[in-house]
Amino acid sequence: MAKLTALTLLGLGLALFDGQKSSFQTRFNVHREVTPVELPNCNLVKGIDNGSEDLEILPNGLAFISAGLKYPGIMSFDPDKPGKILLMDLNEKDPVVLELSITGSTFDLSSFNPHGISTFTDEDNIVYLMVVNHPDSKSTVELFKFQEKEKSLLHLKTIRHKLLPSVNDIVAVGPEHFYATNDHYFIDPYLKSWEMHLGLAWSFVTYYSPNDVRVVAEGFDFANGINISPDGKYVYIAELLAHKIHVYEKHANWTLTPLKSLDFNTLVDNISVDPVTGDLWVGCHPNGMRIFYYDPKNPPASEVLRIQDILSKEPKVTVAYAENGTVLQGSTVAAVYKGKMLVGTVFHKALYCELSQAN
């Protein structure tokens, strides 16, 4: 009887292991290879070598870029150097990056580790930049005021909250108001690792304001990018390891109601929204295994999706760019401005391309 019990337990354990292995391979898309999709004129951005994880382009063509992210389990080519915020003027013929100086007596530059970013412009045209920061592997949101003439950021405030335990990305909806994705439920790195590998789908989205903080969506397998429609009525959330983008209706009281989901054959990361057309531009990881288990001989590929008419019954999804990692490794974000596209990566370079007429 004891042997039968042991054999049964062994069989259940092996079945569980096989099921978990199969689930892991599916979630990380380990067998995916990309079919190249080229654009007519692409150039690597000089001065970006250690990541450009998120970016946002203002209506006037100024682009903010978060650079130098150190994320647990992800490659970093310069792990001891603090991160920074870069600026590009996309109106220039050959735009270059400029590091924005950061002022503010209480801000610690030495531990700056920027992740997702978002901007908010008020009625007086003051631009506020919100930056997800991971000082010493913690999660904060840093609020800055952009000083265009000085080419600097004035640090205004550091935001911490128990419902912001593992922030990945944010979308600003006011000067101190935002939605934030938490890519994990746990804070401890060991528990985070188990959470991700077991596919617990415990990550969630938080609404934050100075007087009201609450969970507004949950049950995600690594909630990642988040953005909002130009009219402010819909919120888009990328679920990285489920390969989905969710559309939520936003209500006047800031609650979110699920509307629809789109499935993809790629790991969807950050979402940019064209303010004119409403199209979504999504930085993606075709094969997640190569991001989380880096091999320089077999680097992670890059892929950019364009989603048109996402609210319709049949949204149009186009691969705008795809490359096997020879040029650009680990794309996380893409945004467009006047026929040009800027693509960022989690730990590698950035690419600036002309869009073809088909796009």
UniProtKB/Swiss-Prot annotation:
State its location(s).
Secreted, Extracellular space
Q: Which UniProt keywords apply?
A: Antioxidant, Calcium, Disulfide bond, Glycoprotein, HDL, Hydrolase, Metal-binding, Secreted, Signal
What is a GO molecular function of this protein?
Answer: calcium ion binding
Q: Which reaction does it catalyse?
A: a phenyl acetate + H2O = a phenol + acetate + H(+); An aryl dialkyl phosphate + H2O = dialkyl phosphate + an aryl alcohol; an N-acyl-L-homoserine lactone + H2O = an N-acyl-L-homoserine + H(+)
- Give the transmembrane region(s): none
Quote the cofactor binding remark: Binds 2 calcium ions per subunit.
Primary localization class, coarse: secreted
Q: Which residues are glycosylated?
A: N50, N253, N270, N324
> What does the record note on quaternary structure?
Homodimer. Interacts with CLU.
Any extra detail in the entry?
The preferential association of PON1 with HDL is mediated in part by its signal peptide, by binding phospholipids directly, rather than binding apo AI. The retained signal peptide may allow transfer of the protein between phospholipid surfaces.
Name by which UniProt lists this protein? Serum paraoxonase/arylesterase 1
The scientific name of the source species is Oryctolagus cuniculus
The organism's taxonomy opens as: Eukaryota, Metazoa, Chordata, Craniata, Vertebrata
